[in-house]
């Protein structure tokens, strides 16, 4: 049995899986990642500033235009990675903690989901607090009702993670018998720090085309994630 087949078998047999995922899960769906050679941070100088609370506060229209031009991919669809993970959550065997804000796990009907950094497609008015359909947001950054400024419910640089998301993520990890890291370099905190709350008996797998260097014991599965999940039976 190959290492990859063994890892797929481990995944199929586990009963309390936690998937910890990042932008690499959505690149097969046509959404660019952030830190690769062709990623947003490489292509755009000062991208972290453009995605900060400071830029939003100082230049709200430019912030809106930047998000609209660079982060929204409304025609993107879930790929086999999202689909297999979602199927496992629907069976009650898994949960997903993701850094992704692209809503593809929601489209895939993921049952147990923590969108740690929020969701671009959940938009609200900063004046009245009302939720607004994202289609309206892509037409205008101002609320038709009270002309308040609209923004997506995502965590910008200089903003904190919602405590409810932290609590749910920790709860999932404490119950895990298997943690699967996929599509992330696992260097962004506090997301990467969540691993410290895992069940001490949980096995950790990392699925990535390139080897990862992580400061804890784990099994490296060096394979493209699409190929890996195509071989997973759910």
UniProtKB/Swiss-Prot annotation:
Keywords: Cytoplasm, NAD, Transferase. Belongs to the sirtuin family. Class U subfamily. PROSITE patterns: SIRTUIN. Nicotinamide binds at residues 101-102. This is NAD-dependent protein deacetylase. It comes from Lactiplantibacillus plantarum (strain ATCC BAA-793 / NCIMB 8826 / WCFS1) (Lactobacillus plantarum). NAD(+) binds at residues 23, 27, 35, 99, 101-102, 117, 184-185, 208, 226. One of its GO terms (molecular function) is NAD+ binding. Its EC number is 2.3.1.286.
